[in-house]
């Protein structure tokens, strides 16, 4: 539950204004807790969730930072049950709906659209999947720039995998190559952070 994670994070020394609340099915009390602690942002999965965050922030006289979890329609070469970035997966806002959701958010008084969030799955062994994600993110950032929309926060991911069946055949992807993939392939603007 979010309360435990938030309190443990703060106790461990993480400032609340660096915490991102991600995940489906956020309860109102969890959103209120995030608002009370002025967390960095909420990763929003849908328009109804965006509307709830706006309403709860309005009741507190606050503005909540939001990033949209976009479903990039990028497949990860992993088990079908743990992919999260294909159009048929239930997670996030579809690419086709992104412009509409941004327009909805810009009309709201108590949310501020600050970023995009992407996650393509877990147990990923092929770094090419992350390159494909970067290419899609670059397309969307170009699209935002064409609309003169500046966001400062880009959050990308997917879980690195281990080939448990054949551990010697394929080495575990390392964090260095994982982060180098993003560094080499993402075309962030000078005002954006990853």
Question: Could you tell me what each predicted segment is?
Answer:
Residues 9, 22, 71, 95-111, ...:
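Structured alpha-helical segments in the cores of large, soluble enzyme domains
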Residues 122-194:
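C-terminal active-site-proximal or functional interface alpha/beta core segments in diverse enzymes
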Residues 7, 27-30, 72-88, 120-125, ...:
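Conserved radical SAM core fold
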Residues 18-20, 39-41, 63-69, 90, ...:
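Structural preference for beta-strand elements that scaffold enzyme active sites
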Residues 35-42, 80-93, 126-130, 165-176:
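Glycine-rich tight-turn/loop motif centered on a GG-T
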Residues 46-112:
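Conserved anion-binding
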Residues 11-18, 33-41, 58-63:
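Glycine-enriched alpha-helix->loop->beta-strand junction motifs that scaffold or abut catalytic
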Residues 1, 5-6:
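Short, small-residue-biased leader/transition segments that mark boundaries at the very start
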């Amino acid at each position: 539950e979010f309360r435990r994670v938030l309190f443990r994070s703060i106790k461990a020394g993480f400032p609340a204004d660096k915490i991102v609340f991600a995940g489906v099915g956020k309860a109102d009390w969890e959103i209120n807790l995030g608002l009370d602690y002025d967390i960095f942002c909420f990763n929003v999965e849908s328009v109804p969730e965006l509307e709830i965050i706006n309403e709860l922030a309005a009741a507190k006289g606050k503005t909540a930072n939001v990033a949209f979890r976009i479903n990039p329609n990028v497949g990860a070469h992993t088990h079908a049950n743990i992919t999260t970035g294909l159009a048929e997966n239930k997670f996030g806002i579809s690419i086709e709906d992104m412009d509409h959701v941004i327009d909805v958010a810009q009309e709201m008084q108590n949310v501020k659209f600050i970023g995009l969030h992407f996650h393509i799955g877990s147990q990923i062994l092929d770094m090419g999947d992350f390159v494909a994600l970067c290419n899609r993110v670059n397309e969307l950032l170009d699209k935002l720039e064409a609309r003169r929309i500046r966001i400062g926060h880009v959050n990308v991911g997917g879980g690195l995998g281990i080939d448990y069946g054949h551990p010697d055949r394929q080495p575990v992807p390392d964090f260095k190559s994982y982060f180098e993939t993003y560094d080499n392939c993402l075309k962030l603007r000078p005002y954006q952070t990853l």
